């Protein structure tokens, strides 16, 4: 099975070390462009662009990278409760059209009550997933070309429609990650790819089996991806030394503050990440070559595969054997590590190298009439 390998655009900062300004660098458009172009040339399928108040806006970043890349896809966040599904569908179709079919979307419900309150969202965990399920249903139907009337608990639209369809049919693929029961149910019913953070293989296997069974109950099949950091070097000793350097500037106070911030979230996935290390520096290798040091201060994906190329490839193939075909990777700093992964890891894997998409012809169209419909040629009798 060929594997889709994604990289990451660090719109929330980058550097050589975690938790310090030491070794950090400016993350401006030029730097993000360097990373995107490196990923494009090295054969990555796409890049994940993060979302949240600590990040630059993912949609604007993705749009700015379209003209400077050729085949790279952009995995961009959809934010239910923050954006209406109709506006989000219009944005999604536009990004897909402008990129010639290189748009992918990642459903992000949010998990930090403080951040959500700042965005005007005051729903609890279950309500957010209810709203997300309604949002996704409307979003998908619009991209399928339907005129949508929907009267749900959280979402209400009347006569919603898109005038400009996406390039990808039936619609651009939808990704989603969540560990709670309600999150897995949403994934099983509506998304195309279920993502998990990098837990030990036995825990990932359990999740996959749960989601696969729930999808089957809806008469659906779903694909799987995993989000991991990677520290790969020519030798395993060098890789483990690099891992230790990454957290060498962390002090206990910074770790404690980070863990306190994570504790206030209601994300089951974040709780599972935190439980892998319990905020302690010792015993960070939680499974062979799976290191939890990143999660001491980084929210979300908090584990890294560490080792030489063949060793890390073997661990990736263990996850692939569970049914995972998409790997969303990153490393610090992201420009240099994009090359290291491409040069030291890719040769040991069956990597699906994306082709440069051919321009897709769009139907000729005049200006929309009364903002209501696109004029079409009328057959003469």
Swiss-Prot record:
EC number: 1.14.14.5
Family, per entry: Belongs to the SsuD family.
Pfam families the record matches: Bac_luciferase
SUPFAM superfamilies noted in UniProt: Bacterial luciferase-like
CDD domains: Alkanesulfonate_monoxygenase
Protein name: Alkanesulfonate monooxygenase
Highest taxon, organism lineage: Bacteria
Any one Gene Ontology molecular-function term assigned to this protein's record: alkanesulfonate monooxygenase activity
NCBIfam families hit by this protein: alk_sulf_monoox (TIGR03565), PRK00719.1 (NF001939)
Gene Ontology terms describing biological process: alkanesulfonate catabolic process
Catalytic activity entry: an alkanesulfonate + FMNH2 + O2 = an aldehyde + FMN + sulfite + H2O + 2 H(+)
Function: Catalyzes the desulfonation of aliphatic sulfonates.
Alphabetically ordered keywords of this record: Flavoprotein, FMN, Monooxygenase, Oxidoreductase
Keyword Flavoprotein in record: yes
Top class in the EC scheme: oxidoreductase
Other notes: FMNH(2) which is absolutely required for this enzymatic reaction, is provided by SsuE.
Gene3D superfamilies referenced in this protein's UniProt entry, alphabetically: Luciferase-like domain (3.20.20.30)
Subunit and partners: Homotetramer.
InterPro entries linked to this entry: Alkanesulphonate_mOase_FMN-dep, Luciferase-like_dom, Luciferase-like_sf, SsuD_RutA_monooxygenase
Claim: DNA damage is one of the keywords in the record: no
């Amino acid at each position: 099975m060929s594997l889709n390998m994604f990289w990451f655009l660090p719109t929330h900062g980058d550097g050589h070390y975690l938790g310090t300004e030491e070794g950090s660098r400016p993350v401006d458009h030029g730097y993000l462009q360097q990373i995107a172009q490196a990923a494009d040339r090295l054969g990555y399928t796409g890049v994940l662009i993060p979302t949240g108040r600590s990040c630059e806006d993912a949609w604007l970043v993705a749009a700015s990278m379209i003209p400077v890349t050729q085949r790279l896809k952009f995995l961009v966040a959809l934010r239910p409760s923050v954006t209406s599904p109709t506006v989000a569908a219009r944005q999604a179709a536009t990004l897909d059209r402008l990129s010639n079919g290189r748009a992918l979307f990642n459903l992000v419900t949010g998990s930090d009550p403080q951040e959500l309150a700042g965005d005007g969202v005051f729903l609890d965990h279950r309500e957010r997933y209810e709203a997300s399920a309604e949002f996704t249903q409307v979003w998908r139907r619009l991209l399928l070309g339907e005129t949508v009337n929907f009267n749900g608990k959280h979402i209400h639209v009347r006569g919603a429609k898109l005038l400009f369809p996406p390039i990808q049919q039936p619609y651009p693929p939808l990704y989603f990650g969540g560990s709670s029961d309600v999150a897995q149910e949403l994934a099983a019913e509506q998304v195309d790819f279920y993502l998990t953070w990098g837990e030990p293989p036995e825990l990932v296997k359990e999740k996959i089996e749960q989601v696969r069974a729930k999808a089957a109950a809806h008469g659906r099949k779903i694909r799987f991806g995993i989000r991991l950091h990677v520290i790969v070097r020519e030798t395993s000793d060098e890789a483990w030394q690099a891992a230790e350097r990454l957290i060498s500037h962390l002090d206990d106070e910074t770790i404690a503050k980070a863990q306190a911030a994570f504790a206030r979230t209601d994300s089951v996935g974040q709780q599972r990440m935190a439980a892998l290390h319990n905020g302690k520096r010792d015993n960070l290798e939680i499974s062979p070559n799976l290191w939890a040091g990143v999660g001491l201060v980084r929210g979300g994906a908090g584990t890294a595969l560490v080792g030489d190329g063949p060793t890390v490839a073997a661990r990736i193939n263990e996850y692939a054997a569970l049914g995972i075909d998409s790997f969303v990777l990153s490393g610090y700093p992201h420009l240099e590590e994009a090359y290291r992964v491409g040069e030291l890891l890719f040769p040991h894997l069956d990597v699906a190298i994306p082709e440069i998409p051919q321009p897709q012809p769009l139907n000729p169209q005049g200006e929309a009439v009364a903002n209501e419909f696109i004029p079409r040629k009328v057959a003469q009798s």
